[in-house]
Curated annotation (Swiss-Prot):
Residue intervals annotated with topology Extracellular: 25-301
Subunit structure: Homodimer.
PROSITE patterns xref list: ALPHA_CA_1, ALPHA_CA_2
Keyword Membrane applies: yes
Record protein name field: Carbonic anhydrase 12
Function according to Swiss-Prot or TrEMBL: Reversible hydration of carbon dioxide.
Membrane topology classification: Single-pass type I membrane protein
Pfam families: Carb_anhydrase
Residues annotated for substrate binding in this entry: 227-228
Length: 354
């Protein structure tokens, strides 16, 4: 297709596909929210698994971490989606969701292949931008991206796999405030078209792998659950060790663009704080693909650690330079005094016996 024709088609498709409300209920058709009578504290009344075992998210801290040398880097197949393939972006009433191509999958979760289903985000609000679901040593990040996959070797589709053993695998990306991220703008730039629940738009494909952090071979791995109802404990979690950065402006756009409610709802509710609280993690281990160190123990970002290290090296260099200068100066003064010979005054014998 010629570029001009493709551009025109994309522009046309960027118009909202559905202005009218549509249902975005979870798997079993019931409604739930993050606060209020149908909020997180009451999820287990309608969704028993939410009060059961292996719940997510969790806090990733040193006491529960164990290095596993067998954890290999994941391979991302089909993640580079052609711009000519259009992806459906939807406000599902709980988050902004991007439905993914069926030819996207991950290898490395032996012995099965997991096919991509969708990705979505969790975030806080403009006054408290700490909306990640997983935490590291008690630290919340600004937001969190989840890329959801199902076991395509064992099950025909996501719905069938969702409550089954080894059914799901989710990649979690922790997001912090920093430099602007053009890859995330490929989603954020379309948020105005999915402002209200049920609205959706087609957007051009892009390389989904660009949403992942540097060094994706470093990650936490544990068995947990969906973080939203029905909270099925069927998820193999991979939480990447290193966060990605988005700008303050990008985060603010995410925090202020969307609503939980339909366009015609008389009491609209901003889509904020759509994250579940950290769950108990009794008698489980989190396996890690990297040797435990400063980044894990403190939850500091790689950028902060490098900055501190650089400042330390610079400080040591200055101290050494000053010490060398003082030493040379002292040595120079000693050299200047070498040519001066002091002799005591000795009287002549004649003068002594006069």
């Amino acid at each position: 297709m010629p570029h001009r024709s493709l551009r025109a088609t994309v522009v046309l498709l960027l118009v909202i596909l559905k202005k009218q409300p549509s249902s975005s209920a979870p798997l079993n058709g019931s409604k739930w929210t993050y606060v209020g009578p149908a909020g997180e504290k009451n999820w287990s009344k309608k969704y028993p698994s939410c009060g059961g075992l292996l719940q997510s998210p969790i806090d990733l801290h040193s006491d529960i971490l164990q290095y596993d040398a067998s954890l290999a880097p994941l391979q991302f197949q089909g993640y580079n989606v052609s711009v000519e393939k259009l992806l459906n972006l939807t406000n599902d009433g709980h988050s902004v969701r991007l439905n993914l191509n069926s030819d996207m999958y991950i290898q490395g979760l032996q012995p099965h292949h997991y096919r991509a289903e969708q990705l979505h985000l969790h975030w806080g609000n403009r006054n408290d931008p700490h909306g990640s679901e997983h935490t590291v040593s008690g630290k919340h990040f600004a937001a969190e991206l989840h890329i959801v996959h199902y076991n395509s070797d064992l099950y025909p589709d996501f719905s069938t796999a969702s409550d089954k053993s080894e059914g799901l695998a989710v990649l979690a990306v922790l997001i912090e405030i920093g430099s602007a991220n053009p890859s995330y703008d490929k989603i954020f730039s379309h948020l105005q078209h999915v402002k209200y629940k049920g609205q959706q738009v087609l957007i051009p494909g892009f390389n989904i792998e660009e949403l992942l952090p540097e060094s994706p071979g470093e990650y936490y791995r544990y068995e947990g659950s969906l973080t939203t109802p029905p909270c099925y404990p069927t998820v193999l979690w991979t939480v990447f060790r290193n966060p990605v950065q988005i700008s303050q402006e990008q985060l603010l756009a995410l925090e202020t663009a969307l609503y939980f409610t339909h366009m015609d709802d008389p009491t609209p509710r901003e889509m904020i704080n759509n994250f579940r609280q950290v769950q108990k993690f009794d008698e489980r281990l989190v396996y890690i693909s990297f040797r435990q160190g400063l980044l894990t123990d403190t939850g500091l970002s790689l950028g902060i650690i490098l900055s501190v290290a650089l400042a330390g090296v610079l400080g040591i260099s200055i101290v050494l330079a000053v010490s060398i200068w003082l030493f040379k100066r002292k040595k120079s003064k000693k050299g200047d005094n070498k040519g001066v010979i002091y002799k005591p005054a000795i009287k002549k014998e004649a003068e002594v016996h006069a």
